[in-house]
A protein has these predicted regions:
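Amphipathic alpha-helical recognition patches that constitute DNA-binding helices
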Residues: 12, 82, 96, 126
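Residues forming the Rossmann-fold NAD(P)(H) cofactor-binding site
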Residues: 99
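Conserved catalytic-core motifs of GNAT/GCN5-like acyltransferases
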Residues: 118-122, 135-146
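Acetyl-CoA-dependent GNAT
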Residues: 4-8, 15-91, 102-104, 108, ...
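Active-site acidic-Proline motif in GNAT/NAT acetyltransferases
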Residues: 89-95, 123-124
Length: 146
């Protein structure tokens, strides 16, 4: 089930965030960086994100357990919304959940009259092919600090 995240979800969102980074970015990001990821720091991050009026975070859960999430930004001063995060645990990928989360964000984006939605993906991240299947297209290249 997909639903809007609440403050009670910050810990499971942070746990999925850290685990998903470790699963997805192995061999893309240095292992020492992945080893330093902290659920506590991510919990603080997601608590802050959920307090922001222009952000929406949706979680995917099964049996009352959060297994994935997507975060969207709807800036008040720009015509483009953003997919800021989409993370699913490895064992649920390929079931259409990511697509459903993206479609939910695109629908909200249209409702709010945004012209486009953007997201950033590391070049070596194979999920860029997932985004292309959802209709995304390459705009520009930058480094991880962009």
């Amino acid at each position: 089930m997909i639903r809007l995240a609440t403050q009670q979800d910050v810990l499971p969102i942070a746990q999925v965030h850290v685990q998903s980074w470790r699963e997805s970015y192995k061999n893309i990001i240095k292992q020492e960086i992945l080893d330093k990821l902290s659920v506590e720091q991510r919990t603080a991050l997601w608590r802050s994100v959920l307090e922001q009026e222009n952000r929406r975070v949706f979680v995917y859960e099964e049996n009352a357990q959060v297994l994935g999430f997507a975060a969207f930004n709807f800036p008040v001063d720009a015509p483009i919304s953003e997919l800021r995060a989409l993370y699913l645990l490895q064992n649920i990928k390929g079931r259409g959940i990511g697509r459903d989360l993206v479609q939910l964000g695109l629908g909200l984006s249209r409702e709010k009259s945004y012209q486009h939605m953007q997201c950033s993906v590391l070049n070596l991240n194979s999920s860029r092919y997932f985004y292309e299947k959802t209709g995304a297209y390459f705009v520009s290249e930058g480094d991880a600090s962009d």
